[in-house]
Amino acid sequence: MAMIFEVRVGLRDSDAGQADITRCVLVNAGVADSRIIEQYRADRCTLSWYERSRAQADMHARRIRSLKLKGAVVSVAGIKDADWTTRWKKYFKPFNITPDIRVVPLWTKHARIPAGSIPVYLDTTFAFGSGLHATTRMMAGFLRRCRGRRGRFLDIGTGSGLLALIARAYGAQNVYAIDIDPVAVKTAFSNCKANCCAFEYLKSVSFEDFRIKGQFDFVAANLLTQDLIRLQKKLVGAVAPGGYLAVSGIFHDNYPLFSRRFSSRALVRVAVAHEKKWYAVLFRKRAPAVSPLSRQGQVSVE
């Protein structure tokens, strides 16, 4: 039986900032914030997440212990892979991620769907993207804002496939989704089947290695700040003129850096969302200017 490893960090809730410090250290070490479950009980706050490698779990535990946070208790425990789903079900219940999209755990598929809600069925298993995290919710909000603009959609770091499924529900005709984690891609494929749909492209590949053919009407990138800055040229190039680029995963301490470094004359900032110390930004790519000479010879049909 395969094992996964739960890392738990118990903190004093009364010590302001401990949870934020811990999250920031973990995110900077490569743990996606959407994987971290935060619970409060009495005067304690507990952060927990799961790793498939014991060495990786121990490395993160040592990193947190090295912070020497007062009253912090760090532990690593192995659990059977099959037990992960049972544990996760305690935290994951049906909810509306936007006013008209309802995320429904697959194990509650027969639950009543409120009138006016579009269900998106999800089995997160070990992948990211349950929709419970602020970054995912803000991106879903941007998708709703741009709904009805049919075309090609690219989801970078798709995780469970949730944003790609929402894009499809909002009218995207061609959906492309990539993730560097093959486990996430496998989960996204299962979620496609659960929703009786298919993506035009779903593969395990990094964005750096992704060979872009054509441009997209909407590109969603939920990545760390430094990765967004490093990849901005390719991100901007992937967007069709008049199309949208939505980025999130920007921790509030990094937002000033992002604002300075992520800039392109080709982009117009349309909206900024801020929730629970996380930022997301929606850009629109400028359409190329048409010179007076290029207008000569054009025929107008009324």
Residue ranges, per PLM feature:
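N-terminal auxiliary segments of SAM/dcSAM-dependent transferases
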Residues: 2-113
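Conserved beta-strand segments that form the floor/walls of ligand-binding pockets within enzyme
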Residues: 6, 102, 119-123, 179, ...
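A generic alpha-to-beta junction signature in SAM-dependent methyltransferases
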Residues: 30, 147, 239-241
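Proteins enriched for Cys/Gly/acidic motifs involved in redox and nucleic-acid/cofactor modification
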Residues: 94-134, 140
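Surface-exposed loop/turn positions
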Residues: 99-101, 151, 243
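Conserved SAM/SAH cofactor-binding pocket of Class I
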Residues: 126, 130-212
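S-adenosylmethionine
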Residues: 180-290, 299-302
